[in-house]
Amino acid sequence: MSREDELLEKLDECENATAFLQVSNKIINLKLKALLPKVFVQDDLVKEYAVDPLLKEDGPLATTDVVSKLMFAMGKISLETYADIGLYDQVLEFVVTQSEKVEFADDMIYDFIKNQSVLSSQQDSFYLESINQLKFSSFESFSQMRYEALIKTVLKLSCEMLIERIEGEINQ
């Protein structure tokens, strides 16, 4: 089982949105770094002396933000994909600065989901419609549990869909 697959399974174990965002951002970073060598000249010498040093843990391409900017600048990922990667990164930066863990039911997580282009396509808009129905329903305690479970499910789906889109755009 790959590190990415292990982390995808760990998403189900996350107790709150803060933990979820930390794991999902690791997954996105791993996927970007795994695909990054494909955007460069495919030459062993170039890979050994230029690409590999860039990808080291302490190299200039260590952060998700820098890697996604490079891929976007090279025309390898779309603006929508770049924006979604940036949104994951920005929301993570925000939640880790909070004194308390951010919960799945937090309005900020709702806004995060609403602003993802990967979920705003016509075919995937039913996820947002389902969330809206539960968020604004009147069955408080029952709906709250279902709402949080739905948020977690949609977050996991959005992460998986973003990973698939990144891979599809890089490999085309």
Residue ranges with predicted function:
Residues M1-F72, K76-Q172:
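Amphipathic alpha-helical interface elements
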